[in-house]
């Protein structure tokens, strides 16, 4: 009887522990959300900028991104705007939003063409395309774009210390395209389409 009772009690304890964890997480998330809303409603842009910088340093990129986006209109004509935009672009990159990051890096170069960070940002734009390169079985448009942009970077910045990595990435992308071509040819062969396979293998 005691054994049966313990078998019933243990799952209940386990369920209550999980439920407590969920409730605690909801409370924490709710309080964080309220804190962000309060910060975004704060009328002091300088305070918001300080908080955004703290979030960025702590790698809390979602929060930093929200605050940077909110204060951009206040700082658009100021000396701080370049650094804000730079970190805003990196927020997108660090959050894995590589498509948005590429667009932001591109915009940064258009807005600040003479920036001391222009070479770095130019590379990161190309690298963002590389990060969007999928496995060989899928469409390789971004792989080819990454190759082209890395080559353009090398041509534009002939003395850059990043050129070695750019060259390595081009080689990786080229190998991926070759792998895709081989797998496509192998698929034709496996399907018995030997003429198409022959053309693909010899391409």
Where are the model-predicted features located?
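Sec-dependent bacterial lipoprotein signal peptides
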Residues: 1-32
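Acidic, polar-rich low-complexity tracts and alpha-helical solenoid repeat scaffolds
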Residues: 5, 28-203
